[in-house]
Amino acid sequence: MSFIRLRLFIVLAICCIWSVSAHAQTIISGHVKDLQGEAVAGATVLLYSDSLLTPPMKGYAITRKDGSYSISPKSGGDMWVQAKCLGYKDRKVKARVMPESTDIVMEHDERSLSEIVVKGTYTGIKIAGDTVKFDTGHFSNGFENSVSDILEKLPGVSVSEGGNVSYGGKTVDKLLIDGRDLFTRESDGLVIKNMPADVVAGAEIIKNYKDGTPGSNYGRRDNTALNIKTKGLGRLSGYADASGGYKDKYNAKSFTLGTGNRLSLTAILSGNNTGTPVFSLNDYLSHMMSGSNVTASGQTSIKISGAETSLLYRPDNLCKDMNNIATLNAKYKASDRLEINGSLLFNHSDTHSRTERDETYLSADTLVRSASTTDNRGNFLTAKLAADWRPTDKAQLRWNIKAGMSDISLGTAATNSGTSGTKYDNTAKNNGRDIESNVSLNVSAGKGLLFVNGNFAWNDDKDRSMLTTNRRLLPVDYGTADNGGNDFYISQHRTTHRLSIGSEAGYSLNLMKCVSLNASVSQQHEQNTLRLTSEQTAGGEDKIQTDEYSANIFARNTKGALKVNAGASVTVERSSITGRQSENRVKVYPSLSLSYDFSNAHSLSLSLSRTKNRTETAKMSALTLIDSYNEMTATSAIDTPFQTGTSLSLNYNNYNTASQTYLTVYANMQRQDHALTPVVSQEGTTSTVAYAYGSHADNIYAMANLEKRLSAIPLSIKINLMANYVESPSVLNGMDNTSTLKSLKAKAVVASNFRSMFNGEVSLAYSRHISDIASSSIKTDISGIDAGGKLYVKTGRLKFTASMAYSHSKTDTYRYDIYDVGLCLTLKKVDS
């Protein structure tokens, strides 16, 4: 009996060992051939864990005479193979595990032999296919504090205040750290602005980036990724600093970065009352809004209340500015096929400002000087949860839900000089709640991709306002009260509800391996309700309901120097507004873009499209809305929420690494048909505005960036030019009118990059803004000059920065000059 048990034990042990061995054995195999089907012998096949080919390799092999190869990696998960051979272009494909074959087709490259010889001065840039590699050490001088500071010194790269990165005028879609997608989309900007510069070893811009998902090969446009190479990140890293100053000034910040095999997170605590921004408009949009709020034609609809606007667009006249923020973003890779991420953000802001301005009254052709103080307090709390599941290699399911709350209070006290002699206090409170969710499914079917998307959004905003004044200027029934001389008041309570539900289904495929075709049908239903309660004006309710049904088709070629992207959306638009006739119409929104690549670093693109924008609910309402102590909005004549127009854009990039000259030119012209036109009835200093259709409105914007690095001495020169022209129609007391705004900005910066303890930079900027109202002799002309310089000194662990700045601005009525001197001493502590 014991012998039988022993035999059984041995058999079970062998089976277990065999099963474990079989489970652990993963084989990647296939053949490498050229376009004619001939075997490529002697090619090197490298195996990596991601599409960026981030070291270390998982394995490699040399192809045999018949072009075959076989690799047995030590670990599993997603894998990519790269084939390299002299005389052929490098080829990269996603690996398939046996019994499936990972075959690779390589293309002859006649230029490969000539590219072996490198001549000229070292530029710190290497262009290989769709990847631009930067030697960040070549461009930095050691005084950079964050990743953002380093990126801003790279040719062609720009970073916005919120941390959004652009390359050649195009937004970067994905942030990678050492080839890994570690962070949530909401936290990318925070990482860029807060990750220490000391950890950066290099940077790469990857054009035509693909993440290996089923839908990555069928997008309507190419995606761009930024890969930050580090010197090595610990599982938990970060920093904290705090400072204080005169008149109870404080500035504190902490940044925590956690990276692991499955879990990565970022946490930021930041606050100050010195005016340093910690929460920008871009941060607000990325956390409070989402891509789910999209109409059937692909347009994004974003609405921001007046109280939100006053909090997010921070003016220059703040005499008190406290801002605190706490964020937590985490991404967890539950398995090779399931990824979960979430984010949480809280922001508190408290500001106080003083303003003196000239108010224009066209009916009397006069200016009245107004002085005011404003207190603004606000809180935001948002949370998001998302999941990305790939049940098979051919399917991907994405889902996310986002919830947000806002609480904003605004108080203004003002007095007017001159003939008006008016003073008033205005208190406004805004409470907002919103929930948004979307789900998408991508499935590889046949020779293409089947995709289905759905979205849901709900918003509830409550605005309460109380205006007290010493004069009754508006044609409404004021209430009476004793409030320090302000004996009259107007109170209003607005509630806005929004519900949006949409869906889209379509199919994408690649034809002849060079043309991508995308066809879909979509629908979007939206309902906006505005309720008004007031003691002084008639209350009521307005409902605006829209339905869009679209058929969309787009095509683009993916190979060749000349690329064409063309398509159109045919949309049936139905809208109804309370008390007005419903409208049905059919519109076509075509788009065409052409781009030509003279080389990997030299390109020109043109795009032309018909556009659509949504009109704000308040500008379509039949209700009487009080906007200010002397302004009100009356019944609107707008009967459709859709405003159409035309957009024309040009983008030119020339990155000459040999001469180290980098030029980017971008221009855009937008024309709105039958523009939304304010019809102003003005009597003295009182205005009533109603909106109607008018002539077209134009907005022309042009920008040019030139960067030049001198080879004789380590100096870099950056020149930025920006021009803007805006023309919009209006009607004043029955007379057609046109308002124009002309803006010009120019800035030049010269910075040194010596390999020594001393460096510096000088800058000079000029700006001018001219606004002109055709029906009036009143014209505003504001010009300014800003000059500055910085001296950097570094020795060992000690860094010293001295700065000087001068700012000059003048108009027809005032002029100011500001001088600024700053000193900063930093001692870096190094633990052995």
Which stretches of residues belong to each language-model region?
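Membrane-proximal, glycine/serine-rich, low-complexity loop/turn segments characteristic
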Residues: 25, 35-37, 68, 89-96, ...
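Glycine-centered loop-to-beta-strand initiation motif
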Residues: 30, 45, 63-71, 75-79, ...
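Short, acidic Ser/Thr/Gly-rich low-complexity loop/linker segments typical of extracellular
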Residues: 52-68
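Face-selective signature of the C-terminal outer-membrane beta-barrel domain
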Residues: 333-349, 378-411, 424-579, 597, ...
